[in-house]
Amino acid sequence: GMGVSGGEEGARYGPSLMPGGTIEAYKYIEDIVVKIAAQVNDGPCVTYIGDGGAGNFVKMVHNGIEYGDMQLIAEAYDVLKSVGGLTNQELCSAFTEWNKGELESFLIEITSYIFAVPDDKGDGELVDKILDKTGMKGTGKWTVQQAAELSIAAPTIAASLDSRFLSGLKEERESASKVFKEAGLGDIISTINVDKEQLINDVRKALYASKICSYAQGMNII
């Protein structure tokens, strides 16, 4: 089998390919996959991974790392909005700047765009109307299960999976929120004064360090 990554852009401009199986079989298709793969400065985004389902295994871990990436971005957004009080315009600017440096990536880029999308059926931006409930295809869970089987710590990826589980419990979360409010536990974070520029820089550094951890955990599983 062969893992494929790249989405719509990959289909148009070349994907990242992770072929597995026998090396003899790979040699038959090597010329083809090298040509259709995405091309970067140091060569095509394809390499022979190994026997059997090794290619699909790497793709599974790739998705697990991406789970971690998305959760880290979500938490960075939450801190900037909830603690820093950044507007969607300011969030868009911050993520746009981040995408010019060490955090440059597809996920950071599209996140910056999301903040600027207007709600064509109401006021404000669409990001504030998105249902805070997510689903999953299973590859993140498989990655965490495999890490456990191998006795390998993957806390960032595992925490991102837990967050998805909690995300699905919307009714329970809303009920718990009412209990907290009835107990007099309000939103004290909104009363905190912070230096926005300092917070943006601190969150950028924290996000970068956390992403390195997520990638390291995935590579350790492989």
What spans do the regions from the language model cover?
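A conserved active-site cap/scaffold subdomain adjacent to cofactor or substrate pockets
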Residues: 126-214
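Solvent-exposed, charged interface segments at domain starts and junctions
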Residues: 93-98, 156-160
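Rossmann-fold dinucleotide-binding core
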Residues: 1-93, 100-125, 129, 167-194
